[in-house]
């Protein structure tokens, strides 16, 4: 059995070799000749999976180690009788911590308390729901917009996008990309919406590039109206609008979900799905794969305030480390993908062991995802 895996999927070789012969290949473009005698294909979001790629091939199963699936023609796979699995939620924690890293940086730079701000979350799935929980643990007011969930009658106080634009100081997008239909998200932030944003609004897009109209956003920024903008995703990736990058506060190369834990979850989820598909079901414990974190333990004295949270969060991940490299190479062909391929190891907050002498700090840090324990001072 021959299994093709994207060369940038961590732990793919060691896991899938338990099931058959593994060949690691580039994801963009996939070397088509390798598909002729392969049984399964494991990809990431850079690979377009459709009839053009797989028609007439022997592939019986496709796995994508990503939460999003807009790069996969699921209808064609189903019609062709090809098994399929994605990895929903695999990198949700990573994206939430990316958003926090950016917000804590902007709050320090501009001198505001996050607790004084209202955050509008557009798309309340795996990422949006976790972001809401962590913000609310800090006492930060959130407004939720998720029309599909509202229409299904899901529990929650769902508002219209218009209400979020009017009331929120921070607007962050966490939707899938739907190009048409009743829940279309293509250019959800269109020229009209971007024009209605209050001066000083923070706009964050860490889901899919085309959810925000990049041309309209640049036009508003060029008009000199104050917005703070954080973009991890771009229209036309791997190309991006360099003029837009120059105008925004934080710009990164579609890496918000790129923690070691998130990538490992993506790989293990599709590995488990494929092992079940071929009747050899296996489970993998994530911590058996991950290396020891960079920091052993941190001791925290006293309660948790915003500057302390920022220091802890940025000890694990400071978003600025990914902003600078993109600005250096923006517009040079091939460099966007190279930044993603050669991405520096990044961990999640759970990798940081924090000993707190203040019980409330330990409880709060634990709610926020840190590995925190209360250890009273003697």
From Swiss-Prot:
Q: Which reaction(s) does its UniProt entry say it catalyses?
A: 4-phospho-D-erythronate + NAD(+) = (R)-3-hydroxy-2-oxo-4-phosphooxybutanoate + NADH + H(+)
Binding annotation for NAD(+): 146, 175, 232, 257
Please tell me one Gene Ontology term that the record gives under cellular component.
cytosol
Residues annotated as transmembrane: none
The annotated pathway is:
Cofactor biosynthesis; pyridoxine 5'-phosphate biosynthesis; pyridoxine 5'-phosphate from D-erythrose 4-phosphate: step 2/5
Top-level taxon: Bacteria
User: Which annotated residues bind substrate?
Assistant: 45, 66, 258
Q: Catalytic center at which residues?
A: 208, 237, 254 (proton donor)
Subunit text: Homodimer.
Q: Which HAMAP family does this one have?
A: PdxB (MF_01825)
Protein name (Swiss-Prot/TrEMBL): Erythronate-4-phosphate dehydrogenase
Recorded source organism is Citrobacter koseri (strain ATCC BAA-895 / CDC 4225-83 / SGSC4696)
Q: Which gene encodes it?
A: pdxB
């Amino acid at each position: 059995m021959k299994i093709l895996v994207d060369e940038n999927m961590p732990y793919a070789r060691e896991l899938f070799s338990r099931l058959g012969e593994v060949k690691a290949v580039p994801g963009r473009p996939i070397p088509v000749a390798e598909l002729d005698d392969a049984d399964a294909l494991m990809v990431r979001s850079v690979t377009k999976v459709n009839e053009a790629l797989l028609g007439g091939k022997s592939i019986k199963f496709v796995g994508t180690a990503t939460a999003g699936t807009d790069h996969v023609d699921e209808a064609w796979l189903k019609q062709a009788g090809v098994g399929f699995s994605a990895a929903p939620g695999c990198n949700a924690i990573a994206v939430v911590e990316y958003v926090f890293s950016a917000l804590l940086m902007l709050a320090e730079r501009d001198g505001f308390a996050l607790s004084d701000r209202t955050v509008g979350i557009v798309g309340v799935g795996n990422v949006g729901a976790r972001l809401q929980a962590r913000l609310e643990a800090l006492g930060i007011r959130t407004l939720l917009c998720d029309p599909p969930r509202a229409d299904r009658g899901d529990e929650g106080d769902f508002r219209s996008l218009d209400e979020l634009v009017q009331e929120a100081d921070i607007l962050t997008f966490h939707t899938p990309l739907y190009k048409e239909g009743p829940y279309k998200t293509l250019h959800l932030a269109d020229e009209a919406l971007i024009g209605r944003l209050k001066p000083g609004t923070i706009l964050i897009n860490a889901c899919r590039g085309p959810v925000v109209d990049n041309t309209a956003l640049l036009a508003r920024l060029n008009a000199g109206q104050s917005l703070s903008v954080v973009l991890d995703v771009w229209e036309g990736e791997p190309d991006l609008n360099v003029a837009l990058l120059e105008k925004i506060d934080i710009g990164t190369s579609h890496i918000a979900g790129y923690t070691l834990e998130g990538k490992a979850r993506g790989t293990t989820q599709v590995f488990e799905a494929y092992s079940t598909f071929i009747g050899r079901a296996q489970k993998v414990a994530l911590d058996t794969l991950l290396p020891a974190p960079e920091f052993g333990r941190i001791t925290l004295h006293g309660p948790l305030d915003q500057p302390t949270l920022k220091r802890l969060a940025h000890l694990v991940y400071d978003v600025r480390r990914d902003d600078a490299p993109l600005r250096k190479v923006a517009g040079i062909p091939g460099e966007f993908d190279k930044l993603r391929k050669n991405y520096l190891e990044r961990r999640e907050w759970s990798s940081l062991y924090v000993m707190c002498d203040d019980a409330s700090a330990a409880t709060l840090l634990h709610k926020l995802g840190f590995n925190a324990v209360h250890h009273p001072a003697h």
